[in-house]
């Protein structure tokens, strides 16, 4: 999604973000493909791999690619790898059979881009560090970048363009940052992604981060990559808040949780309803923690 720089600046100022100049890359062509190519990266033990994938598809539906063993890092390693395509989001699952080279495992998501070199230039111009320089993988090229606030993301490009079906609902990438880095991260990521702020609530209900007596700042962003929810906190988070990297939107929360429980998924926070959303946090076999939500207005 292309956004004229002046419009972006207006929205940022309206959202209370400081007017610090961003590099000129904001005017460069966007490199996003589509939200279904935003894949959450999940690392599980090889022994839990099959059970985890089965629990995902039992909970959300969808399909999987064939499980294979690959080297997906620039240095020697070996991992089980499988792509899970659900109606509510895509996931890349890794089960390393060797020690995991640093910093792999810290990247929350992979964004497919139209041109990896152009994406790297745009990311750098907008303040991201390239913490893993571009390298070839079995089906294309990858890199890992880090935004202000310590937010790590993979950028990837495929030699043969993939073709995933459109999502039923677009998941949210849930990013926890400090007040010191919230404005910087938000401004720079929006410039890179050609995104927009769709809401900025400085007094969002604290129940969303496990603190029902408090409020916090919540910023919601949309771009061609998908959705990002920025949760601005002081870091005083009760477990499991902060561990969930993705929020999945479903049509019926109770029905989804019934399927999840039958597949061995644990509901680890009490479901709540606030601001038109019903939500909870769950833990899948293998340890993966995720938020699941539905519109409270759906019947």
Descriptions of predicted regions:
Residues 7-19:
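Bacterial N-terminal signal peptides
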Residues 31-34, 41-88, 125, 133-148, ...:
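Core segments of cupin and vicinal oxygen chelate
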Residues 1-6:
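Positively charged n-region of N-terminal signal peptides that target proteins for export
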Residues 35-47, 82-84, 96-122, 141-146, ...:
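Vicinal oxygen chelate
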Residues 19-25:
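Sec/Tat signal peptide C-region and signal peptidase I cleavage site
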Residues 91-96, 128-131:
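Catalytic cores of nucleotide-enabled group-transfer and carboxylate-activating enzymes in metabolic
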Residues 143-164:
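Short, structured interface segments
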Residues 156-161, 292-299:
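Short beta->alpha transition motifs characteristic of CBS
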């Amino acid at each position: 999604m292309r956004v004229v720089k002046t419009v972006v600046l207006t929205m940022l100022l309206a959202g209370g973000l400081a007017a610090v100049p961003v590099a000129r890359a904001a005017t460069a062509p966007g490199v996003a493909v589509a939200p279904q190519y935003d894949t959450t990266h999940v690392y599980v033990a090889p022994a839990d791999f099959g059970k985890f994938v089965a629990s995902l598809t039992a909970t959300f539906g969808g399909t999987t690619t064939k499980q294979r063993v690959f080297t997906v890092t620039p240095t020697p390693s070996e991992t089980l790898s499988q792509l899970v395509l659900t109606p509510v989001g895509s996931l890349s699952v890794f089960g390393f059979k060797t020690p995991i080279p640093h910093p792999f495992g810290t990247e929350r998501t992979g964004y497919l881009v139209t041109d990896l070199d152009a994406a790297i230039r745009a990311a750098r111009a907008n303040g991201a560090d390239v913490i893993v320089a571009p390298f070839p993988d079995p089906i294309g090229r990858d890199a890992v970048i880090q935004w202000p606030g310590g937010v790590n993301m993979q950028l990837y490009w495929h030699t043969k363009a993939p073709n995933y079906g459109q999502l039923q609902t677009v998941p949210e990438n849930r990013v926890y940052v400090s007040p010191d880095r919230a404005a910087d991260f938000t401004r720079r990521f929006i410039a890179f992604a050609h995104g927009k702020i769709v809401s900025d609530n400085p007094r969002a209900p604290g129940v969303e981060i496990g603190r029902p007596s408090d409020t916090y700042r919540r910023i919601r962003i949309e771009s061609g990559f998908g959705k990002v929810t920025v949760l601005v906190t002081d870091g005083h988070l009760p477990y499991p808040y902060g561990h969930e990297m993705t929020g999945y939107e479903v049509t019926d929360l109770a029905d989804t949780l019934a399927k999840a429980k039958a597949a061995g998924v644990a509901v680890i926070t009490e479901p709540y309803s606030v601001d038109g959303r019903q939500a909870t946090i769950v833990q899948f076999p293998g340890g993966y923690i995720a938020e699941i939500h539905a519109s409270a207005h759906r019947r």
